[in-house]
A protein has these predicted regions:
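Surface beta-strand/loop "capping" patches
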Residues: 126-145
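Substrate-binding/catalytic cleft of secreted carbohydrate-active enzymes
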Residues: 1-126, 131
Length: 145
């Protein structure tokens, strides 16, 4: 293992027994901004990362500003990772039209299936931007890395 790379383990949030040896950062999924801020106000020893946040399924990416505002106020807040970045789908030839189309989930008549649950990115599977990307671009563009 490369000792120079930070280690991330989201499970430390659920079990603090090994937090000093198992993870170099505090990490949670989908923590509301208020919970993130409570951690950051309490003299944290480790930076905070949202390993998943802003799940973009349907029209659900709203609320990004609340998280981005924390970047301006807390140095130990490192931001987060949007789930998902790109839809997960496959190009297949449509049996009726003969055209290449994107299919996912229940499109293959497989069971069990989460149907469109793999279609939750800020880009379509063909890398075409979705409207939610406009909000991400707007707020991310206001912050330096």
């Amino acid at each position: 293992m490369d000792p120079g790379r930070p280690v991330h383990y989201e499970g430390v949030f659920q079990n603090r027994a090994y937090e000093d040896s198992i993870s170099d950062m505090e990490s949670q999924m989908y923590a509301p901004p208020e919970r993130v801020e409570a951690y950051l106000r309490d003299n944290p020893r480790k930076p905070f990362i949202l390993c998943e946040y802003m799940h973009d399924m349907g029209n659900s990416l709203g609320g990004l500003k609340s998280y981005m505002d924390l970047l301006d106020r807390y140095e130990m807040y490192q931001g987060g990772y949007i789930w998902d970045f790109i839809d997960q789908a496959l190009f297949v030839r449509d049996e009726v039209t003969g055209r290449e189309v994107l299919r996912y989930g229940g499109d293959f008549d497989d069971r069990p299936s989460d149907y469109e649950f793999s279609g939750n990115g800020i880009l379509f599977a063909d890398r075409t931007p979705k409207p939610a990307l406009q909000e991400v671009r707007y707020y991310y563009g206001q912050h330096e890395t």
